[in-house]
Regions:
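Conserved CoA-thioester-binding segment of acyl-CoA-metabolizing enzymes
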Residues: 1-66, 230, 314-338
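Crotonase-fold acyl-CoA enzyme core
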Residues: 105-248
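Acidic-histidine catalytic/liganding microenvironments
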Residues: 22, 57, 76, 110-111, ...
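Hydrophobic/aromatic residues within transmembrane alpha-helices
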Residues: 28, 65, 78, 129-131, ...
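C-terminal long alpha-helix characteristic of the crotonase
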Residues: 33, 137-142, 193-271, 279, ...
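Glycine- (often His-adjacent) and acidic-residue-rich active-site loop
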Residues: 67-105, 122, 150-152
Length: 343
């Protein structure tokens, strides 16, 4: 059996990832549909473990990454977890980013083709996940979107590195600055994905080019419209079969060679990103951005600009901790209290 015997997928006992192997194909599914398949800290560890196992298993030739259900492929990190945990302990966000790096690098370093099966929206780190994959098949009702600058973060876990070499500089900037949804047809036209497959039906009829209204009705199950992923599954299975019709060592080295520019951009920047984000999580931007997202309200972007323009601090909520509190005498208090009066 050698030093790396094949293990049954079920033996790992994952809680937030569904792992399966069949006919030389490993399927890794983010199993958090109630959270739009946002990955938690635990999910990142399970994803990296699954990819490492699939990489080492000679009974696996192709890997498929997807999400549960039809609403989301992956929506990046769990913003509720961010808001509750990481904005209060930014040092732990550095550790979290180490887990995220391990997950993304486990995709890059599998030595085997990885197919992203976009069963729904790919947002934030979800887009970074599909960018890390080798090929992407996208359901027509899905969309791609970045959110970083609108939630107090920066999409430097793959998007800032790989979008310029995937869609070009100007389009990358459009995606990253504006954070607007990119529908499937545009994603295909821009080269973000390889194939788009119809996924909207009305009764027995497939809608070959569903418009935005038809997609909304299908997602809500209105007027006879519904989402059907059967053609997506057939396309992914057909692609996996094509990929298996090649020599494994040649496929592995082809991936290594083609990864050159992705590896270069990634390794030159991601450790800086990890450290900067950990430091940034001590500031007011992620606190406001993440809480606004969780509370489903607009973030107060203009407040920071107004403070900075008035000569105040835009980095901390109540000003830098440089004053002695007039009420209690405590040192290193913020410049202002929540009511805006000097401390």
């Amino acid at each position: 059996m050698g030093q790396f015997p094949s293990r049954p997928a079920a033996s790992f006992g994952f809680a937030e990832v569904l792992y399966a192997k069949s006919e030389f194909v490993a399927t890794i599914t983010i199993q958090r549909p109630q959270n739009y398949n946002a990955y938690s800290t635990r999910a990142l560890e399970e994803l990296a473990t699954a990819f490492r196992d699939a990489s080492f298993d000679d009974a696996v030739g192709v890997i498929v990454l997807t999400g549960a259900g039809h609403q989301a492929f992956c929506t990046g990190g769990d913003v509720k977890e961010y808001a509750e945990d990481y904005v209060t302990t930014p040092r732990d966000y550095w550790k979290y980013m180490a887990l995220f790096r391990a997950y993304i690098e486990s995709i890059l370093n599998t030595g085997k083709p990885v197919i992203a099966r976009l069963n729904g929206m790919a947002v934030g780190g979800g887009n970074e996940s599909q960018l890390a994959c080798d090929l992407t098949v996208m359901a027509q009702h899905a969309f791609i979107k970045q959110v970083g600058t609108h939630v107090g973060s920066v999409a430097c876990g793959g998007s800032t590195q790989w979008l310029p070499i995937t869609v070009g500089d100007k389009r990358a900037r459009e995606i990253l600055f504006l954070n607007e949804p990119i529908p499937a047809a545009k994603a295909l036209d821009w080269g973000l994905v390889n194939w788009v497959v119809p996924s909207v039906r009305r009764g027995d009829e497939w809608i070959e080019k569903a418009d935005a209204q038809e997609i909304r009705q299908a997602q809500r199950g209105e007027n006879g419209y519904r989402i059907d992923l059967s053609r997506l599954d057939k396309e992914v299975a057909k692609l996996a079969k094509k990929l298996l019709a090649s020599f494994p060592e040649c496929a592995r080295y082809t991936k290594q060679q083609v990864n050159f520019w992705k590896d270069l951009a990634w390794h030159q920047t991601v450790r800086h990103a990890q450290d900067w984000l950990a430091l940034h999580y001590t500031s007011w931007e992620p606190v406001e951005g993440m809480r606004a997202f969780v509370e489903k309200r607009p973030a107060r972007f203009e407040l920071l600009r107004e403070r900075a323009a008035a000569g105040g601090s835009s980095e901390t909520q109540w000003g830098p901790p440089t004053r002695v509190c007039g009420a209690c005498g405590v040192d290193l208090a913020p410049v202002a209290t929540p009511q805006g009066t000097p401390a």
